[in-house]
From Swiss-Prot:
Residues 65-224 are annotated as: Spike head. It comes from Rotavirus A (strain RVA/Human/Indonesia/69M/1980/G8P4[10]) (RV-A). Belongs to the rotavirus VP4 family. A motif (DGE motif) lies at residues 308-310. Keywords: Capsid protein, Coiled coil, Disulfide bond, Hemagglutinin, Host cell membrane, Host cytoplasm, Host cytoskeleton, Host endoplasmic reticulum, Host membrane, Host-virus interaction, Membrane, Outer capsid protein, Viral attachment to host cell, Viral penetration into host cytoplasm, Viral penetration via permeabilization of host membrane, Virion, Virus entry into host cell. The record marks 231-232, 241-242, 247-248 as: Cleavage. This strain probably does not use sialic acid to attach to the host cell. In group A rotaviruses, VP4 defines the P serotype. This is Outer capsid protein VP4. It comes from the Viruses. A motif (KID motif) lies at residues 644-646.
Length: 776
């Protein structure tokens, strides 16, 4: 465009701080090789290992080995082993159903010749003959009778070096061990009413689930782990297993310590995290068979949920780190299917979810310690994405799945225009799951991970439930709020100034003379002349330009620019005003995905109006790269901006960067663009209106979407400053020649000035409408 301000912003023709450039490069750099980011990745905090403190949990986790418990009499649960650990020889356990089974187990020390000993069994003294020929191992012997007055018989002896024994109720039988360690095996005794058998233990014992078979057998054969063989382990009463566990409250605010001005508050919160992935799918130029990129993008999600009767408003941002780059090349022909790069997250990737809600816990989250979280896992499965080829069957990327496992939590900060919010960043490590992903009708199959094509699988969101805990240093007076950063107050004050400046700018639209505007739009405005009304020195202007570019780099228009190919960026920085247009190949990427949408309009539920309303920014970028010798919308925008800056009484260095950036995106939102093919003109406006007509007669003809897409790819896009409605009205009322019509179609500034100097009401009204659209 004629005015250079936006092009200078696009090409970063002014120097910026080295730290800003390093930060920018680091944020845009894509790595094919993923490194382990560590537990404090992408945060500004040192790698300090804070202890989690106490985290109340409403979930009971069953221990592998529970005990030791003191000798007692009770009814053990079914499918749980009593692991008996006697210290001395004698009776160690007895149990009966009082009907047809009396079972007792005795322990005999090593090296005992056959002898008769007296044992007290079920309260009665009995004479039992025992022996143990082993000199190193202890001998467990089961004594059994089937009537209350019967005689005991000996069964299933176990020679044990660790001196451990087990008994369990399961499947209608009483189970014990027999044989010789380290190869002991189990043996069962059928017992009626087995589940009601009471056991009396005469030694310390443990309880271990039947499901832990390999662990339990290892204990029987080899002994308890070393930590259990110490006098620091004190047996407790079995009644401790019956303690009622209080369920933790969903919201808990606990005062840890307090002084006159400050207090430490511990916040325990149940949490529901909902998040979703976002992606970018970009087609390459050409015939429509090639895709340049399928990548993940950060995704914001806002939602509400109920926590302990309280409605919580939450906000999450999901991003990925450590993506894996894949590609598919079906051949070198223009009609061969190609995906230059598509991203996949796998076990070497991480998913970050930044979470904030409006509860008390986040109000003063500035000085925080003892941060901990416990979250459930979540399975993310990929859906189908069809690659719409112009001809032939469409390949479909389908499948793929990963599980997300909690891998830590740190503090993070989310910035808005009004306030910076301290939030929690939950980090998830990944593991690949079934099914694998593939691309149908290609050789790509049997790959694992989650591709970026359709990561949400048509789900609105993924959900993770859990709990977090933190201790925060907050003011003792609950009415005070800890200042998060000075930028909060500064930003709020700046927003007030910007609001006043916007009102002034919008009011100044009524005072701009159109002849002055056209003349100013023809000038090669640059950064220095744009800021000349504020600072006179070159150094100050450079500083101002640097600040403008810092703002502009984060704007929506700059984001769109960054998605274009390098060749388009080069063309945008080197193009000069002339009658011939180049950068055709580079600019194709700015339109290809839009043309595809328009071509496929018949197969979608969206209307042409809806689809064309989404292409305004790309048409605008195409206009920047393909200039003619006529004026365009950005010439008018820059001229209006310059005029308002000169007339403003409230403009200041602090507010100028925001105003320039905002103007580059919002001035003249309702734009119309045209392409020309000999005597035919096709126009598309950003509000969805399409029209086609012949220049000589201004007769409307059917709008050919395919032709429009082809012309946009191969021809300059012209700003329709004087749109078709205005042209037809001008011709019907005043009559214009063919040459005048073509000059107005090209937005020739000399022709525009001529009509304005003649005080033509139709042209004047059109320009006034454009000026009034230059609003903030």
């Amino acid at each position: 465009m004629r005015s250079l301000i936006y092009r200078q912003l696009l090409t970063n023709s002014y120097t910026v701080d080295l730290s800003d450039e390093i930060e920018s490069i680091g944020s845009k750099n894509t790595q094919n090789v993923t490194i382990n980011p560590g537990p404090f990745a992408q945060t500004g905090y040192a790698p300090v290992n804070w202890g989690p403190g106490e985290v109340n949990d409403s979930t009971t986790v069953e221990p592998t080995l529970d005990g030791p418990y003191q000798p007692t009499s009770f009814n053990p649960p079914v499918n749980y082993w009593m692991l008996l650990a006697p210290l001395n020889a004698g009776v160690i356990v007895e149990g009966t159903n009082n009907t047809n089974r009396w079972l007792a187990t005795i322990l005999v020390e090593p090296g005992v010749a056959s002898t008769t000993r007296t044992y007290t069994l079920f309260g009665i003294q009995e004479q039992i003959t025992v022996e143990n020929s082993s000199n190193t191992k202890w001998k467990f012997i089961d004594l059994m009778k089937t009537t209350s007055s019967g005689t005991y018989t000996q069964h299933s002896p176990l020679l044990s070096e660790p001196k451990l024994y087990g008994i369990m109720k399961h499947g209608g039988q009483l189970w014990t061990y027999n044989g010789e360690t380290p190869n002991a095996i189990t043996n069962g005794y059928p017992t009626t009413n087995y589940d009601s058998v009471n056991m009396t233990s005469f030694c310390n014992f443990y309880i271990i689930p039947r499901s832990q078979e390999s662990v339990r057998t290892g204990y029987i054969n080899n002994g308890l782990p070393p930590i259990q063989n110490t006098r620091n382990i004190v047996p407790v009463s079995i009644s401790s297993r019956s303690i009622i566990h209080q369920r933790a409250q969903a919201n808990e605010d606990i005062i840890v310590s307090k002084t006159s001005l400050w207090k430490e508050m511990k916040y325990n919160r149940d949490i529901t995290i909902r998040f979703k992935f976002a992606n970018a799918i970009i087609k390459s130029g050409g015939l429509g068979y090639k895709w340049s990129e399928i990548s993940f993008k950060p995704a914001n999600y806002q939602y509400t949920y109920t926590r302990d009767g309280e409605e919580v408003n939450a906000h999450t941002t999901c991003s990925v780190n450590g993506v894996n780059d894949f590609s598919f090349n079906g051949g070198s022909l223009p009609t061969d299917f190609v995906i230059s790069r598509y991203e996949v997250i796998k076990e070497n990737s991480y998913v970050y979810v930044d979470y904030w809600d409006d509860s008390q816990a986040f109000r003063n989250m500035v000085y925080v310690r003892s941060l901990a979280a416990d979250l459930n896992d979540v399975l993310c499965t990929g859906g189908d994405y069809s690659f719409a080829l112009p001809v032939g069957q469409w390949p479909v990327m389908t499948g793929g799945a990963v599980s997300l496992h909690s891998a830590g939590v740190t503090l993070s900060t989310q910035f808005t225009d009004f306030v910076s919010l301290n939030s929690l960043r939950f980090r998830f490590r990944l593991s690949v799951e079934e099914p694998h992903f593939s691309i149908t009708r290609t050789r790509v199959t049997g790959l694992y991970g989650l591709p970026a094509a359709n990561p949400n699988n048509n789900n609105e969101y993924y959900e993770v439930a859990g709990r977090f805990s933190l201790i925060s240093l907050v003011p003792s007076n609950d009415d005070y709020q800890t200042p998060i950063a000075n930028s909060v107050t500064v930003r709020q004050d700046l927003e007030r100034q910007l609001g006043e400046l916007r009102e002034e700018f919008n009011a100044l639209s009524q005072e701009i003379a159109m002849s002055q505007l056209i003349d100013l739009a023809l000038l090669p405005l640059d950064m220095f002349s744009m800021f000349s009304g504020i600072k006179s020195t070159i150094d100050a202007a450079k500083s101002m330009a640097t600040n403008v570019m810092k703002k502009f780099k984060k704007s929506g228009l700059a984001t769109s620019v960054s998605t274009l190919t390098d060749s388009l960026s080069d063309a945008a920085s080197s193009i000069s005003r002339g009658s011939s247009i180049r950068s055709i190949g580079s600019s194709a990427s700015a339109w290809t995905d839009v043309s595809t949408q328009l071509i496929d309009v018949s197969s979608t539920v969206n209307t042409i109006s809806t689809q064309t309303s989404t292409i305004s920014r790309r048409l605008r970028l195409k206009e920047i790269a393909t200039q003619t010798e006529g004026m365009n919308f950005d010439d008018i925008s820059a001229a209006v901006l310059k005029t308002k800056i000169d007339r403003s009484t409230q403009i200041a260095p602090a507010t100028l960067p925001d105003i320039v950036t905002e103007a580059s995106e919002k001035f003249i939102p309702n734009r119309a663009y045209r392409v020309m093919d000999n005597n035919e003109v096709l126009e598309a406006s950003t509000d969805g209106r399409l029209c086609a007509y012949r220049v000589e007669t201004f007769e409307e003809i059917p709008f050919d979407v395919q032709k429009f897409a082809d012309l946009v790819t191969d021809s300059p896009v012209i700003s329709a400053i004087i749109d078709f409605k205005t042209l037809k009205n001008l011709n019907d009322n005043y009559g214009i020649s063919r040459e005048q019509a073509f000059n107005l179609l090209r937005s020739d500034p000399r022709m525009l000035r001529e009509f304005i100097n003649q005080d033509n009401p139709i042209i004047r009204n059109r320009i006034e409408q454009l000026i009034l659209q230059c609003r903030l």
